[in-house]
């Protein structure tokens, strides 16, 4: 019998001790049960309105309990998930968005993966203090790499030396990679983000989660399901295609919910934010450039943001933008440049950031919050002919801000499908290729998030299979304590 199993199973631990000591007798009065196993589903974009189109999750809510979830500012994936897992605000854990300006590097970086960026006591640390040997599987929640979890599955493309990018994932333990790939195929990265993003990626994640639960039985399983993020941003939350996406995801989830029920798992389904209808893109960096505050450098006719030389620039992240101002004397000029820009609802200074628990050194000197029907582009060039070549690619790591237009193929290019087919043909024979199909026009976007919700119906939600587990509302900072309590460790 392994000592790892003994650490998880009190009766096994007693047997190990007795085997090592012939005079020892089993302690039949031990009351140290295994924690209640949990399945925590991050159903991106889930709101009370969408729940009406998701009968399996609605049934779970009806039989158990549910409440509006009070999210954090910014209401984006990395910040919200970090709050769920640490019980603290961005001001404490330091995840001020899906990316930020790394001042020491002079570079804007989004979608980093190292858990070391998240400060604070993690959920699994607290669980293991209460129950040594507590096991955790993180399946696609962010900042997974380097986390002290037992099982990890997270997206990780193969970047070949010739510039090619191919789908894949990272796992821990490493042998799990080939096990999942043999059973379910290569992780479908190009269905996870980009013009081809659809249910295929969430189905793969669901299949991987079911396999890990049935073969490893972790005490806590975290599962991230991105499907609602796609069509709700493309078409808006009330479009029939978005409502169909909700029904499709609910149907795909049913076998996983059945597995959890059969194993006696408590299920928690929650969301980080609700996606609301938008129609106004706000070119915040172009306003700063026209004011002479943002600088670019040019190579081969293409303009690149120069964050180290700029007096001020913005890192756009959905409906939030961190504005980095190099010198205090430029703060007033930066405010003036943005004061009349349509679409900005609030411009948070030091006091405003403190009010919203966003006062962290990684935050911008100012933080812009969009009006309800607006969102921020990252665009900084003034002429599309001078845009960098990566602007028309799915390049989440090279763009100095979030670009939801990557969900589309350029509708104005009559040859866009021919270009895509040619690039795909080059890829299949092992040649380098450029899938330059993303439009430079932001107007197709119909859904966004990042602001605090105006109403509960449009905000995130928490569902628990346990009756009376939650009260009238749940704060994002209380999710960690709630999960510990549901596990019997609170």
Where are these regions (language model features)?
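A short acidic (Asp/Glu
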Residues: 50-53, 148-150, 233-234, 278-282
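Short, structured active-site-proximal loop/turn typified by the sulfatase FGly-forming signature C/S-X-P-X-R
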Residues: 49-92, 135-137
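Secreted, luminal/periplasmic, and some membrane-associated catalytic domains
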Residues: 34, 43, 75-76, 100-116, ...
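Short glycine/proline-enriched loop/turn "hinge" motifs that connect secondary-structure elements
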Residues: 32-33, 212-217, 449-456
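Beta-strand elements within well-structured catalytic alpha/beta cores of enzymes
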Residues: 33-49, 60, 84, 127, ...
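C-terminal substrate/ligand-recognition segments
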Residues: 421-438, 443-455, 460-490
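Active-site-proximal N-terminal segment of extracellular/periplasmic enzymes that hydrolyze or transfer
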Residues: 2-7, 21-68
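His/Asp/Glu-rich, glycine-adjacent segments
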Residues: 3, 11, 17, 23-26, ...
């Amino acid at each position: 019998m392994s000592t790892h199993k003994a650490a998880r199973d009190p009766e096994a631990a007693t047997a190990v001790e007795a085997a090592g000591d012939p005079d020892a007798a089993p302690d039949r009065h031990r009351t140290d049960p295994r924690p209640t196993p949990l399945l925590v589903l991050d159903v991106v974009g889930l709101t009370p309105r969408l729940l009406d189109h998701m009968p399996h999750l609605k049934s779970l809510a009806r039989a158990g309990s549910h409440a509006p979830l009070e999210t954090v500012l910014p209401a984006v994936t990395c910040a919200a998930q970090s709050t769920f897992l640490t019980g603290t605000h961005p001001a404490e854990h330091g995840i001020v968005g899906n990316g930020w300006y790394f001042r020491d590097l002079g570079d804007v970086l989004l979608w980093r993966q190292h858990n070391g960026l998240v400060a604070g006591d993690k959920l699994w640390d607290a669980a293991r203090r209460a129950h040594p040997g507590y096991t955790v599987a993180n399946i696609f929640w962010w900042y997974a790499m380097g986390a002290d979890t037992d099982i990890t599955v997270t997206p990780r493309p193969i970047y070949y030396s010739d510039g090619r990018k191919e789908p894949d994932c990272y796992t821990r333990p490493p042998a799990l990679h080939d096990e999942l790939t043999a059973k379910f195929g290569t992780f479908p990265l190009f269905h996870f983000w980009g013009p081809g993003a659809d249910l295929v990626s969430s189905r793969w994640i669901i299949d991987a989660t079911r396999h890990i639960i049935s073969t490893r039985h972790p005490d806590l399983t975290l599962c991230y399901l991105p499907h609602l993020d796609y069509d709700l941003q493309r078409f808006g939350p009330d479009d029939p295609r978005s409502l169909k996406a909700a029904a499709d995801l609910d149907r795909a989830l049913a076998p996983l919910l059945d597995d959890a029920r059969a194993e006696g798992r408590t299920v928690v389904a929650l969301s980080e934010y609700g996606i609301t209808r938008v129609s106004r893109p706000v070119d915040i960096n172009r306003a700063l450039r026209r004011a002479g505050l943002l600088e670019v450098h040019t190579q081969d006719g293409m303009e690149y943001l120069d964050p180290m030389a700029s007096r001020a620039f913005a890192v756009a992240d959905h409906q939030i933008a961190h504005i980095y101002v190099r010198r205090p004397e430029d703060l007033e000029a930066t405010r003036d440049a943005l004061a009349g820009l349509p679409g900005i609802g609030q411009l948070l200074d030091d006091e405003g950031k403190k009010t919203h628990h966003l006062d962290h050194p990684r935050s911008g000197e100012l933080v812009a919050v969009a009006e309800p029907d607006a969102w921020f582009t990252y665009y900084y060039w003034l002429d599309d002919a001078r845009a960098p070549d990566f602007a028309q690619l799915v390049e989440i790591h090279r763009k100095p801000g979030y670009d939801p237009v990557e969900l589309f193929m350029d509708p104005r290019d009559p040859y866009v499908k021919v270009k895509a087919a040619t690039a795909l043909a080059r890829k299949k024979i092992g040649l380098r290729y450029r899938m330059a199909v993303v439009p430079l026009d932001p107007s197709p976007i119909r859904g966004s998030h990042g602001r605090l919700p105006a109403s509960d119906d449009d905000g995130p939600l928490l569902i628990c299979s346990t009756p009376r587990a939650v009260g009238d509302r749940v704060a994002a900072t209380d999710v960690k304590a709630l999960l510990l309590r549901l596990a019997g460790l609170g």
